Amino acid sequence: GGLPLAAMMPTEEQKAQYLDQLFRETYIMDIIARNKVRQTQELEDIIDVLASSVGALTNPTKLQATFQSKLKSKISLNTLRHYIEYLCDAFLIHEAKRYDVKGRKYIGTPLKYYFEDVGLRNARLNFRQVEETHLMENVLYNELRLRGFNVDVGTVQKRTMDSAAGKRVSTSLEIDFVANQGRKRYYIQSAFRLPDEEKVRQEKASLLALHDSFKKIIVVKDAIKPRTDDDGILTLGLYDFLLNDDCLEW
C-alpha cells in the first residue's frame, strides 16, 4: 500500500495489523457514522465483493444479483448504489468508466472499481487473494491518476471475417487504460507476463485496432529493456514505469 506509516514499519506483521486496524476502526466506522448506515453487514459485504473483483467489469445490478444468489441478501439496488457512493466519497475505491474510443462516447455500464490503496484492499481480504495480475492493474491505475491523468477503461470495436458464417462480424476489444491529460493521450495495456507470441498478439490486438497517432504502451511485470516494435508499440517493465515519470515518452 501507499500509506506512509505502513511503509515505515519494520515488519510485515506490523504493517498488516496497522492496515487492518485502520480499515476497521477508521474507514468503516467513519463511513457508518457519517452516512448513518443501518445495514452495516451489507456495507461490509459490498467492500469484500469489490475487493475480490478488482479490475473486473461490474455494475450495481450485477452486484445485487451476487448478493441475492450467494449471500441471500435482499438489499435494494438503490441502497447498493448509495453504499458504493459512500466508499468512493471516503476515498476507499475509485470508479473507472468505460470509453468507446472510436465512438468517442462513454458507456454507462459495466464499469470497474479500483482501490485507492492496495494495502488496504489486501488487509480487507486478510492478505489471502493477492493476485499479482489484478494488483498490478490497480497499481498502474493509481499511478496514472497520481500523475494527473484522467483514466478510463477503453473499448474498441474491430471488424473481422467469420469464415463459418461467411460475413464480417464486430468484436469488442478492451484497452486497460485510456489516459488523458490535456491534448495528450496514451493507450496502456497491463500485461503481467508475455510468455509467448499468442499472448503478445492478444495484448496488441486492441491497440492495433486503433488508428490514431496517440502512443500505445504495454507494461509487463518483468524487468526488461524498453523497446518499441515495428507497430510503434512501446513495451516496458513495471518498475521503469513506476520510477520514471517521463517513461511514457520513451
Question: What is each PLM-predicted segment?
Answer:
Residues 40, 57, 74, 197-198:
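Loop/helix-junction capping segments adjacent to catalytic residues or to phosphate/diphosphate-binding pockets
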Residues 31, 68-79:
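Short, positively charged loop/turn segments that connect secondary-structure elements
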Residues 56-67:
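Short acidic, hydrophobic short linear motifs in intrinsically disordered regions
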Residues 48-52, 68, 145:
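Short, locally clustered residues in the helix-turn-helix/winged-helix DNA-binding domain
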